[in-house]
Amino acid sequence: MKSKKYLCLLALSVLTLTGCGEAKVSAIEKSDAISKLNTASENTENWKGFTIKETAKISVSGDFSSEVNNLVTSSLKLDVNSSLKGSAELNADEMAKIKSGDVENVDYANLVTASLTTSNSVKYDLKTTINSNESYVTTDVNIGGSLKYGKTTYNNITSDFLVGNINTKTKVKSNMQGTNNGTTEKSDFYGVYNIASSVKNIVGNIDTSDTPSTDVTIDSSLLEKLVAKLDSYISFGANDNMIQVKIDVNDQLLADIMANGNIKLPSEIGDITLPKVTAESAIYINAYLDKNGGFSKFSIDVSKLSLSFNYNLSGLNMACQADVNYSLIISNSSKEVDLITASDFSKEVQLIDLSTLLK
């Protein structure tokens, strides 16, 4: 029963703190949404495993100039793209031991099998003009790779291994002195082992008998005021297959966060305007239900979120624009994850014993 309550609390936390996008739902009250989440958690069978898919795209542009005869002008462009796919599976036998309370005999190294692939790129473009002389630098960085985690035997070592490869490609083009133009590529292969036992030892050696004291206090009334104010930007919806939370994002929301958080900027730093949302956007968080009424998938979606920022200080003008698109999907999965085999270890692999590293 406790696990069901924890699942409901987790779902509610995900839904209120963080997709896919806008769906046809009927508006409901917050109390109804909480009730539906409770019911869904009670109807959810334990997930054997899950899959995760994430994509993100962030674009930032900025212009900088000096009011003193326009001696200095600069423009900046930054593009970030990221994608991730992964899956994990729980070992049913080891999970059964945990549920029965037989934690001493759990083989934690054999508890989880997982795999992950990721691809990321960053493009940085800066142009600066000083006294009509233009300099520029363009950098493209691509980072990708894959990870696998599970228990296996390799090089006469039986343990849980985190095996991965990281591929990096960097391209630089510039007319600035001292810059190394050209393309560089690098691949690294790692095999980290004794992970579960190291974590278990760390947790087991934590002294919980003496709780340290602290003089730090948190003003709960301030947090309550902020949450109460933000509540007006949050709405709930549902249909037969989904429970949805929508968070409206606009310039008034940011202004309320600043005001209720007592965030004040000193006047001596110059004439500054707070970040302003230039395009109406929203964050959609969805909890999908299976045929039994239990949770089958969670998603978070942020699309076409646009922010602008302006700043002026002693003749220096700055204007920045940022556009954000983000999607995350976590799904229940019964598909078995491929176990680690010898073929996953490259000849160039660097074996790292985590237990030795942490000594």
Residue positions per predicted region:
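Charge-dense, intrinsically disordered terminal/linker segments
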Residues: 8-9, 330
